[in-house]
């Protein structure tokens, strides 16, 4: 049974999820405009990514304070603290990928523009499932488990796109070695967004199983 303090924590978790989602939306826009060649606009969007990530981080700290202030049974508090940290890592991964792109500003490989955006979109889909799984913890552990498993499946799909994209980049003779190394870093970091979402989904499974 979820009590009053627990409902307050879930309200704050929802707010945290929305902040992480805002980070990811700014991250997506940044990549889209960079791929189109608008570097100046991408620089502006980097500030949006950083601002939203900072907001998410502050909300994570608020959740931890609420938990240590007495919400949930002592045995469960650590699980939810860990979950908030893992969810926050998704925003961190997006910010890191954005920094890697904007610091190096590599030339976009011709013909691969759509595939880069596709990787971004497929990576962000993992968070959509993660968000649903997290919110489901409040009312239905079965739904939480189902959505956590979908997060894992989506991460695997994003992985396949990531590896295929890297293979294409490294097989191209018209891309310099330097550009290949930079894109390897950027693309791997985009994939990290999906990886971090999967990490959080594992924690949701743990919490859901304990509550069954």
Swiss-Prot record:
Q: List the SUPFAM superfamilies hit by this protein, alphabetically.
A: PhoU-like
Give the InterPro entries listed for this entry.
DUF47, PhoU-like_sf, Put_Phosphate_transp_reg
Pfam families named among the record's database cross-references: PhoU_div
The text of the family note is: Belongs to the UPF0111 family.
Q: What is the protein's name according to its record?
A: UPF0111 protein PH1389
Q: Which organism is it from?
A: Pyrococcus horikoshii (strain ATCC 700860 / DSM 12428 / JCM 9974 / NBRC 100139 / OT-3)
Its lineage opens with: Archaea, Methanobacteriati, Methanobacteriota, Thermococci, Thermococcales
